[in-house]
Structure formats: structure tokens, C-alpha cells
Amino acid sequence: MLPFEKAQPVYVGARAIGVGNAFTAIADDATACFWNPAGLIQCQGVRIFGMNKFFGRSEYGFDPKGISYSYRQTSFAWGNKIALGTRSQDPDYSYYAVARQFGSYLAFGGSLKFQRRHPSRYYQVFGYNPSFDLAVLVKLSPNWKIGLLWQNEDLRLGIDRQTIGLAYQITLKRPNSDLVVSLDLEQDHSINGKSNTKARMGFELPVSRFLQLRGGNSDGSWTTGVGLKCQFSSIIARVDYAWIGDTRTYRSHFISSEIAF
């Protein structure tokens, strides 16, 4: 079993899990801080999110959270993810991300990641074991997006993992019903120098302006999810649920919420 931070995908956000963790090219909410920081540019204004694994915590717990702020062509974000009950002694990581848009079709982003000591008697702004992510998001056409992510795990020169993501939006006849299908291909490098490739795929189908259905497969583990979105004046609230069959007992259920204003 890999240390939790090296085990991929990152499992942040019930919406991303619902589409099979194929989120590198979508990355259009505050969880982009973890999946593809370049995607933060799609989240104008302030967004706050939190997530909880509310069932099956006897196997492991996972409770990420974060906030993003975007104004015009620049975005900033902070995120934290902490796992409980794992073999790697409750790993706790903080992300600090920035993104910048260039033109109408291209954005670059990056994240600095720090491991935090847990438990701790004081707040740790940074921590230890720094590493980084580099990311690109390209809008190839009104319907196609491509996301690229390079991940480093110990701040040495070199990339330990790279991911390419594709997302395609299919316009259906019904209003508010654009189907999005996505695919992620991830390649990592093991200690013995060999490369491992993983595939993740999924879809998101808006049934109405309030309800979205999701499904996918994350490197052999099936996923499903549902989302509810409401708007109150200039405030948008969303609640998402996801299930993934990633353990022997198939009990990994997640719920997350996001507020945008």
C-alpha cells in the first residue's frame, strides 16, 4: 500500500469521484486546487468547499476542504486534505495554488504542497516535505478541453507523475442538459524505474438546472454520484454525493458541498 499522498487519484470532491475521478480537464470548481490548478481560472469570485467520508470510516476517513478566489485572469486557492486511519499515520497536506489565464483558451497553474504534522498544538502555515504540481488547461474548441498535470513528490528535480485529461461537452436538445464525458490517463514512475498507466473515465448529465447525475470507472473501481445545485440571488450552493467501490467492502460514501459568491 502506497503512502496516502502518493496513492492516486486524490479523491477530493464528491463530484470528481462521481465521474470516476476523471477530473483533470473539467476542474471547474474549487477542488481544481488539487486536480488541476490551472482550472481555478474557471471559478470566478469566491468558492468555499468541504467534504466528508460519512460511511465506511472504519477503513479510512478523508475530510478535505479549501477556498479559492478568482478575479479576471488570476486565481488563488488554499486547500487541505487529511486522511484518518491509514497506514501512513494520518497524513495531513496543505496546498497553495495560483493560476493565470492567457488569452481566451489557455491557462497555467501550479501548487506548492506541504505535509503537516498531525496532531499538532499549533497551526502550521507550511510544514515539511515540500513538493509541487504544474498544470495547463487548454480550451481546444467550444466543446473540447484538455488538461495536463505534472506532479512532484519531494521537490527534487524531476516529475514523478503526469496526467492528461480530455473533456467533451455534448449539447442535447433539452435545455440545461449538456452531457460532459471525460477521460484521464495517468502515468507514474515506480521505484524500480518502471512506468504504470491508469485510466479513469466518467460522465456528468444534468437532468435539470438543479439536478446532475454522474457515473464512471476509476482504474477498475466503479463510481456513481448525484449533485444538487441551487442559486439564491448571487450565491450558488451545491451539494454532491458519490460512491466508489474502492475497498473490499464497497462502503466508501462521500458527501461534499460548495458555496460560490
Where are these regions (language model features)?
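Subset of outer-membrane beta-barrel
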Residues: 2-261
